[in-house]
Amino acid sequence: MDASSSSNPDDGLQAIRLVDASDDEPYADAVAKIERCQEILGYDFRDLDLLRSALTHASGASHRLASNERLEFLGDSVLGLTVCEWLFNEYPEYSEGDLTKIKSAVVSRRSCGKVACKLGLDQCLIVGRGVTRNRSYPKSLVSDVFEAVIAALYIDGGPEIVRDRLKLWLAEEVNLAVDTQGSGNHKSVLQQFAQRELSATPVYKLIRETGPDHRKMFLMGAMVDDRRFAPAWGNNKKDAEQRAAANALAELHNAKVPYDSEQPPA
């Protein structure tokens, strides 16, 4: 199975198909899901009970301690440490504040849920009948199983396995976070990205200015290789260009733009 497959690769937080632990053949179903999960992870567990626990939601467990909650607790810290070490080594020019913002974006529930669904872990979950009957459950459920699986990998295979897998799975999320959450100099980041990925240099255009001379507001827009991006307002042209660059970076990564272009701030 291709580890990049997903029920919907464009939205990792869509409704997910769940495995009902109360089906007529729950054991056989769970075994099939465990095997599929190992294929996704590219790793054969020595302790299959550990992996089953990682995939089991509290609603599908015989008792609370048989669910993935304890593994989720450990996986959260393993994920955080691994990403922190990665960022610390890869981005020596970034400040503590920038690294913190990047890390927070990478390990967020949304990011983890999206990656888990791209991998196909949403097809490996084991839950109770009530969850599947209601068809209503928190979207954080998939990010929880992602953290639990990380913990299971850590226990069964060690930190190297976790480090290798996370660098493969989270590379896109790290690049996105670096480009949108990192250095406050968005113009510099946009220029580096545009030259590296698009072989082009951004240009900025004044679209509109408003207000009295002592309190003017400027609307600037960024353009890269003839593609125009959402403009942004600023108290001066330099500030507006920085914000326009931030909007461009967000659009280039299919993310929500951080600055409004409809009207100048009050």
UniProtKB/Swiss-Prot annotation:
UniProt EC number: 3.1.26.3
InterPro entries linked: dsRBD_dom, RNase_III, RNase_III_dom, RNase_III_sf
Keyword Transmembrane helix: no
Alphabetical list of PROSITE patterns matching this protein: DS_RBD, RNASE_3_1, RNASE_3_2
Active site (catalytic residues): D76, E147
Claim: Secreted is one of the keywords in the record: no
GO cellular component: cytosol
Cellular compartment(s): Cytoplasm
Family matches, as CDD domains: DSRM_RNAse_III_family (cd10845), RIBOc (cd00593)
Segments forming domain RNase III: 34-158
Domain DRBM span(s) in chain numbering: 185-254
Keywords tagged on the record: Cytoplasm, Endonuclease, Hydrolase, Magnesium, Metal-binding, mRNA processing, Nuclease, RNA-binding, rRNA processing, rRNA-binding, tRNA processing
Positions of Mg(2+) binding: E72, D144, E147
GO molecular function term, any single one: double-stranded RNA binding
Main location group: cytoplasm
Quaternary organization: Homodimer.
Protein's job: Digests double-stranded RNA. Involved in the processing of primary rRNA transcript to yield the immediate precursors to the large and small rRNAs (23S and 16S). Processes some mRNAs, and tRNAs when they are encoded in the rRNA operon. Processes pre-crRNA and tracrRNA of type II CRISPR loci if present in the organism.
Protein name from the UniProt record: Ribonuclease 3
Protein's organism: Rhodopirellula baltica (strain DSM 10527 / NCIMB 13988 / SH1)
Gene name for this UniProt entry: rnc
